[in-house]
Design a protein with these regions (language model features):
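Intrinsically disordered, low-complexity regions enriched in Ser/Pro/Gly/Gln/His and often acidic
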Residues: 14-16, 177
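C-terminal segment of classical bacterial N-terminal signal peptides
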Residues: 17-27
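Extracytoplasmic copper-binding redox domains, predominantly the cupredoxin/blue-copper superfamily
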Residues: 28-248
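Arginine residue identity/basic-tract feature
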Residues: 2-4, 26, 129
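Bacterial N-terminal signal peptides that target proteins for export
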Residues: 2-14
Length: 248
């Protein structure tokens, strides 16, 4: 009889622990269900993006026979929405929240002798891949600030080469990327801590998995620099932060 009571008691304890863990998990998930949404626009006319001379490589020329390539420093839609702007939480996250590293691996592709996407954002220590879809050799060369803790590197990727898998150790907004073979190829890696987003072709964005709280959101654009905005996220109610950059 004593053994039966001990087993029953142990079962009850385990059940209580399991319920507690389930409740804790639900609480954490609920806390991270918030989001910050908004738009980023350009006030004024977008600068003309120059065409790119790819005559150095016949393969590259052929990829753009019907659609000439242009620089992508500033891409604005008909309504002024700015594409490729990175939004991230620069103040307000706890250490644990800022230290969470996403499991998904974003991909930076070399396609049609351009970087796709032009700007790739990622978390500190988040693994990402550099791939090549082209039938010509590229040499990718990120140029971080070594004093900030990230180490520059450059690697050749011939046709069919496997993706390069790597990560960055510290925050840096932003790391220029170039190709040593094709001088017109340039892009950026933006390395942050915590949730982030990149604007689409309409200038819209959504930062997911934001716990309730008050934050500073920073918007970064390669030509226009940064802007910040204060935003509050409540349980079940997204925060909103809109930005407008003045055209040069």
């Amino acid at each position: 009889m004593r053994v039966r009571y001990q087993v029953a008691g142990m079962t009850s304890i385990l059940l209580v622990i399991a319920i507690g863990l389930l409740w804790s998990t639900r609480t954490v998930n609920a806390a991270a269900d918030g989001k910050i949404t908004g738009t980023v626009k350009l006030d004024g006319s977008a600068p003309h993006m120059k065409g790119i001379d790819m005559s150095k490589d016949p393969f590259c020329v052929k990829q753009h026979e019907n659609s000439p390539a242009h620089l992508e420093n500033v891409i604005a839609g008909p309504g002024g929405g700015l594409q490729n702007v990175v939004l991230y939480i620069s103040e307000g996250l706890s250490g644990a929240e800022a230290g969470q590293v996403p499991s998904q691996e974003p991909v930076f592709d070399q396609k049609n002798c351009m970087y796709t996407p032009h700007v790739l954002a990622m978390d500190v220590n988040q693994k990402f891949k550099v791939a090549t879809s082209d039938q010509t050799t590229h040499n990718i060369h990120p140029l971080p600030n070594a004093l900030a803790g990230n180490i520059p590197w450059n690697k050749s990727q011939p046709p069919g080469a496997p993706p390069i898998e790597t990560s960055w150790k510290t925050e840096e907004v932003a790391i220029p990327v170039k190709c040593n073979i094709h001088p017109w190829m340039h892009g950026y890696f933006v390395v942050v801590k915590g949730p982030y987003a990149i604007t689409d072709e309409k200038g819209s964005y959504t930062i997911e998995n934001v716990p309730p709280g008050s934050y500073t959101v920073t918007a970064w654009q390669e030509e226009y620099g940064t802007q910040t905005a204060k935003v509050t996220v409540a349980a079940g109610k997204p925060g909103t932060a809109d930005f407008t950059f003045k055209a040069k």
